[in-house]
């Protein structure tokens, strides 16, 4: 077993492509896609669970694939997935965090851009070419799922470079519950983000099932009693294969179109989405200011790790 980049943990020898990878054909092109391997519970992962809020039970054995949708034609920040942060392209930091978790048999970047694909290949990051017509990241994940077999697929945002390996254990722990078909993460919402429509809020049932996601401030503190339990949604999703296929086959739903939140398609169609507590917040990079903040954080991490 060889260690993945940036990880002291043993990784599958096929997590990164090598010259003898046979590859799979996606989008009409041969790509270096690792074959899923069997994994179970790893004791060192148990130590990374956030604040004891989740227990990563042994989930039998699952094939788990991580997919990082990465569009180059971003509208708010041009070419953002390839923007350099602390010496690496943004998408590489995301891939390294996911790989370092040790929970996924393979982590693949899914893109419709040959330029993104070329950068990934140069850095030994598995890549799949997907259709330019994919309307959402989940559709891009489904396209990969049709070629890369797994039991669970993790949809990882390619524009969150401050993500760490510790975000994945609480998410995957939810799948120890057989009723969980789809899962995501949330974190305590900082006071300055409560009224920010770009910080999506989520409210859940007592069992962790999402009741609603909104750009509005939910719940509404009618009596102004000083409610502090607002939760911010983090855009990492995991699906069992059947749930992913079901979700991606559905047309956009009315509330999804109003709020511009694709996860509402699940709720409106009666597909339960369970929410785990993340160990912290991340920076979704949409502006030059976000990019600078991410640069500072990643350079601080590098200095700390090398110190």
Model regions and ranges:
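Conserved alpha/beta core of the MobA/IspD/sugar-nucleotide pyrophosphorylase nucleotidyltransferase superfamily
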Residues: 228-305
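Conserved core of the sugar-phosphate nucleotidyltransferase
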Residues: 163-253
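Short phosphate-binding loop-to-helix
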Residues: 108, 114-173
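Short terminal hydrophobic/aromatic SLiMs and anchors at protein ends
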Residues: 21, 25, 32-34, 47
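Residue-level detector of structural "landmarks"
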Residues: 3-11
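N-terminal glycine-rich phosphate-binding loop and ensuing alpha1 helix
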Residues: 55, 61-110
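Low-complexity, intrinsically disordered or signal/transmembrane-proximal segments
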Residues: 11, 29-31, 42
């Amino acid at each position: 077993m060889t260690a993945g980049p940036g990880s002291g943990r043993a990784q599958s020898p096929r997590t990164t492509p090598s010259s003898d990878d046979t590859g799979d054909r996606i989008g009409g092109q041969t790509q270096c896609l690792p074959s899923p391997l069997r994994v179970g519970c790893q004791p060192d992962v148990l130590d990374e669970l956030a604040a004891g809020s989740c227990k990563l039970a042994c989930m039998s054995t699952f094939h788990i694939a991580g997919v990082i949708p990465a569009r180059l034609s971003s509208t708010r920040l041009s070419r953002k997935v390839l923007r350099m942060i602390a010496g690496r392209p943004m998408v590489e930091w995301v891939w390294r965090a996911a790989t370092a978790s040790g929970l996924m048999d393979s982590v693949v970047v899914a893109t419709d851009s040959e330029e993104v694909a070329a950068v990934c290949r140069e850095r030994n990051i598995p890549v799949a070419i997907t259709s330019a017509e994919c309307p959402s990241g989940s559709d891009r994940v489904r396209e990969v799922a049709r070629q890369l077999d797994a039991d669970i697929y993790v949809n990882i945002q390619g524009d969150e470079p401050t993500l760490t390996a510790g975000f994945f254990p609480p998410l995957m722990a939810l799948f120890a519950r057989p009723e969980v078909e789809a899962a995501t993460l949330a974190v305590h919402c900082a006071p300055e983000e409560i009224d920010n429509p770009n910080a999506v809020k989520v409210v859940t049932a007592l069992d962790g099932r999402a009741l609603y996601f909104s750009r509005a401030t939910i719940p509404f503190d009618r009596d102004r009693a000083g409610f502090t339990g607002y939760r911010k949604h983090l855009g990492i999703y995991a699906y069992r294969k059947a749930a992913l296929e079901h979700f991606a086959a559905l047309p956009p739903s009315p509330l999804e179109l109003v709020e511009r939140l694709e996860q509402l398609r699940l709720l409106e169609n009666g597909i339960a989405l369970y929410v785990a507590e993340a160990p912290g917040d991340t920076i979704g990079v949409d502006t030059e200011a976000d990019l600078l903040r991410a640069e500072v954080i990643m350079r601080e991490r590098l200095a700390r790790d090398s110190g």
